[in-house]
Amino acid sequence: MRILVAFDKFKDALSAREACQIAASEVGRHRPDWQIETAPLADGGDGFSDTLTGVLDGEFHTAKVMDPRRNKVEARFGLVPVQNIPLAARKLLNWSSEIEKVAIIEMAESSGIALTPIEGRSPWDVTTAGLGELVKVAQKKGAHGAIIGLGGSATHDLALGALWKLGYRFHDKNGNEIDEAPVPRIWPQISKISLPRCELPSSFEMRLACDVDNPLLGSRGGAAIFGPQKGLTEDRFQELESETERLANLLVATAGAHAALPDDEGAGAAGGAAFGLKAGLGGRILSGYNLVKAWIGLDEKFSQADWVITGEGLFDESSLHGKGPGTLSLEAIDKGKRLSVMAGSIGRIPECPIPQSSISQISPPNLPLPQALKLTEQNLRRAIGKKFALSD
């Protein structure tokens, strides 16, 4: 039996690589004669930079930048020559010929939800300013472009914080510049956006690797789907939604040449960061899952597997809209492979195309979240053991 173990992260508990290693070791313990391949699914969130840079033996750099709450954090990014990127991935990225070296930047390193305490999370006063600082450092280190993994974010600021650090300015109704990070809390004060001078050369290119395909606004938009996990309360949803639409229109009015639209697939990723970086800096949105798949040769591993084991911290409807575990699960079903999806918790999935018998929640249903997070490794080992000690 040939097994492919391909997990995404269990947020606040295990990285994708750790989850894969744990699951593979448990399967191997129960089925020592099986062939096991691992493929961590860093589709834009945690582990994105480490995975892509590490595969190519690229350079790693660190920089002290602003975290979501405007404290300092040491963030890591990678640098790789374009010629070293696998051909299938280069075709997806479609760089201009003058782009010779690119940075691989993980938004979660500077603006990730893991950098904020679970208690008291709120989208109103957190910023992506550190992401902009990280891009600036990477460019000074020799990057001609950047692949930005948009996932695992704490923010819903349309990447306006990043744009602020890269030259954009925000003004009140009297034309006065607002000299602080443009977090949603101060959005009502913003009447105009300007770009007196961009901190990046005009030749600098961005690719925005998203782990979801949600639009910016509406019932499937960034605030509606991902706001609650960032601390957005139901009574303030409409307030944030309305201001998101207004600020998006202001940004497009300033930098309309890049033709970003709120309905663009993936525009709602990372609190609208995909929209903001596309509108403000001409970034191109692409599937993080497809990019990583091409980068690490997942297609070959998948084609050889008889059984696919995948999962993440929360498996819900959004998992089936661009995230690695959901996409891989649908591909496994399509190809008639055996499938096991294991998640910390299972959310609502209307008309789920995956058989319920293939999905299992590793945590006991009534276990409080803090305790469940601490026991994630133990629960994953137990779930794998239960499944494969009894399977045919």
Which residues does each PLM region occupy?
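N-terminal loops that bind phosphate or other acidic moieties
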Residues: 1-150, 154-392
